[in-house]
Curated annotation (Swiss-Prot):
GO terms for biological process: translation. This is Large ribosomal subunit protein bL25. The keyword Aminoacyl-tRNA synthetase does not apply. Part of the 50S ribosomal subunit; part of the 5S rRNA/L5/L18/L25 subcomplex. Contacts the 5S rRNA. Binds to the 5S rRNA independently of L5 and L18.
């Protein structure tokens, strides 16, 4: 998994301070680790968007102005329901020897049988929550859809994990992850109306 550096600034919590920051392109955030005090920070919105909307997960080195760096990953992101802008982010610290739960983006591989028959592949669940050691975490998770037919889905319980023995999928086993939807039927041509000459 790629390591990305991201600058952060310490933030003092004041009334209406978060709203003022957002107007200047700065996103309020917190950094936390089990058993430690939560740290309030702010981060550049543009830099954060590149990470949040990436097709891959990243390990993030958060860099403070005093030179201190802490290793983390994005645990939660809140969006404005109207503008869809990022309004708050949670970063979780971790050490190399502890189990973590991380959301990893889903991708597909293979030429699905259903697609060859005219269907369209649709990812229903765009990220899987994986539990394991940080070193075992992939930047994305590919699901083989080669044998997937139209109208069929691959559920969490059907995803083979033999190649990733150190990882466990934490999502509900019955959750559909990817499916093949049937092609849309073309609209039937309107019946011609006979017009009699008068």
């Amino acid at each position: 998994m790629e390591i990305i550096a991201l600058g952060v600034e310490p933030r003092i919590i004041r009334k209406k301070e978060a709203a003022k920051l957002r107007k200047t392109g700065i996103v309020p955030a917190v950094i936390y680790h089990k058993g430690e005090e939560t740290i309030s920070v702010s981060v550049n919105e543009i830099a954060l968007k590149k990470l949040v909307h990436s097709a891959e997960s990243h390990i993030i080195d958060l860099k403070f102005p005093d030179g201190k760096t802490v290793r983390s990953f994005i645990k939660d992101v809140q969006f404005d329901p109207v503008t869809d802008r990022i309004i708050h982010t949670d970063f979780q610290l971790f050490s190399a020897d502890e189990l973590v739960e991380m959301d990893v983006p889903v991708g597909t591989t293979g030429d699905a049988v259903g697609v060859e028959k005219g269907g369209r592949i649709q990812i229903i669940k765009h990220a899987l929550t994986l539990k394991g050691m940080p070193a075992d975490m992939p930047d994305h998770f590919l699901i083989d859809c080669t044998n997937l037919e139209i109208g069929h889905s691959i559920h969490v319980r059907e995803i083979p994990m033999d190649a990733r023995p150190g990882l466990t999928i934490m999502d509900d086993p019955d959750t559909p992850v990817v499916t093949i939807v049937a092609p849309k039927k073309e609209a039937e041509p309107a019946a011609e109306t006979a017009v009699s000459a008068s």
